Curated annotation (Swiss-Prot):
One of its GO terms (molecular function) is zinc ion binding. Gene3D superfamilies: 3.30.2320.80. It holds the Pfam family HypA. NCBIfam families: hypA (TIGR00100). Belongs to the HypA/HybF family. The keyword Cell inner membrane does not apply. This is Hydrogenase maturation factor HypA. The gene is hypA. Zn(2+) binds at C78, C81, C97, C100. It comes from the Archaea. One of its GO terms (biological process) is protein modification process.
């Protein structure tokens, strides 16, 4: 379950951001949601990621935060016919150009894992 390592990375990054805000004198009440970009080729389960995140964030300001994920589809570039477009990820082990069926291709994207932003509730907000 590699979701645990990803969830831990998200939690640590958000807690670092919270700490920075608190060092600036802002009191963080809680983190409401965290928006992520997740590449389809990471093979992460968003449901499992959310579950693990809930468990590890239990005693933090992230308790109850919802992870919202945008799945990023990989693109393919064919070195033979120069086709560029979306890759069907039904079977990632058989990557071929959908136009000419060449296997001389480069993958572009689909392995991302980024924190886009987070909604944080501060004590000084009304």
């Amino acid at each position: 379950m590699h979701e645990l390592s990803y969830a831990t990375s998200v939690l640590n990054a958000i807690l670092d951001a919270v700490k920075q805000q608190e060092e600036l004198g802002r009191k963080v009440i809680k983190v409401n949601d965290i928006n992520l970009e997740i590449g389809d080729l990471t093979l992460l389960s968003v449901d499992q990621l959310q579950f693990v995140f809930e468990v590890i964030s239990e005693d933090t300001v992230c308790k109850g935060a919802e992870l919202k994920a945008e799945i990023v589809k990989p693109k393919i570039f064919c070195m033979d016919c120069e086709f560029e477009g979306n890759l069907d990820t039904k079977d990632e082990l058989e990557v071929a150009c959908p136009k000419c069926e060449s296997r001389n291709v480069k993958l572009k994207g689909g392995k991302e894992f980024n924190i886009v932003n987070a909604t944080i509730e501060f004590d000084d907000e009304e």
